């Protein structure tokens, strides 16, 4: 209920945060100024700015097989084993990569134009067929499946990150974020849209009580 403002040391946009192995990593940047931002903290109070070797804005960060991977604008992918030293990787795309998740021994990143790329090591990336040209934004992995959300009411699912299935959502608005909690997938989007599913395949609309756009959800 009570929040305390901490000094991050930056005025740049911060897009995402992750906590693994006693370390907090938050990422972001400034799109128009070509500025990339990575901050690292062990306690959430004191933050250290990290040099990444990229000037692209970063949108999302995931952790798997003992490494952090962050994705961003113009197909940017950077990896790190400790959150301090980062290496630029070739993603094979120049599209914006809005989301990344790790599951079933594979990293999956999604972005503009229906872009989906996957990698088993975070170094070598392969383009996958999504079946849509809509931009893709949200991604989560639970119950042995990846679930991806995007524009035009898009929800896609995959068990392996390679083969993707389109699901009927009953809406055409952008679905921006997704999470998994208490045996239910919950997706949120524009115009106050909330959708739920027990399996990622069949979706039901719920009343949110707002018509405002919902950008993200976490549990």
Predicted regions and their residues:
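Residue-level hotspots at or immediately adjacent to binding/recognition sites across diverse folds
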Residues: 1-219
């Amino acid at each position: 209920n009570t929040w305390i403002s901490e000094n991050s040391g930056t005025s740049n946009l911060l897009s995402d945060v992750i906590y693994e192995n006693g370390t907090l990593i938050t990422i972001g940047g400034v799109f128009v100024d070509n500025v990339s931002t990575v901050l690292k903290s062990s306690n959430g109070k004191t933050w250290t700015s990290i040099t990444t070797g990229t000037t692209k804005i970063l949108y999302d960060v995931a952790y798997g097989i003992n490494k952090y991977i962050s994705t961003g604008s113009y197909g940017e992918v950077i990896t790190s084993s400790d959150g301090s030293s980062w290496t630029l990787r070739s993603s094979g795309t120049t599209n914006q990569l809005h989301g990344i998740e790790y599951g079933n021994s594979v990293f999956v990143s999604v972005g503009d134009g229906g872009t989906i790329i996957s990698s088993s090591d975070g170094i070598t990336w392969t383009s996958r067929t999504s079946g849509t040209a809509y931009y893709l934004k949200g991604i989560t992995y639970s119950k042995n499946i990846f679930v991806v959300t995007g524009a035009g009411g898009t929800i896609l699912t995959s068990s392996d990150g390679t083969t993707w299935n389109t699901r009927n959502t009953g809406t055409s608005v952008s679905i921006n974020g997704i999470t998994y909690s208490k045996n239910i997938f919950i997706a949120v989007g524009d115009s106050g849209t909330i959708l739920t599913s027990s399996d990622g395949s069949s979706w039901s609309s719920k009343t949110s009580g707002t018509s405002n756009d919902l950008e993200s959800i976490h549990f």
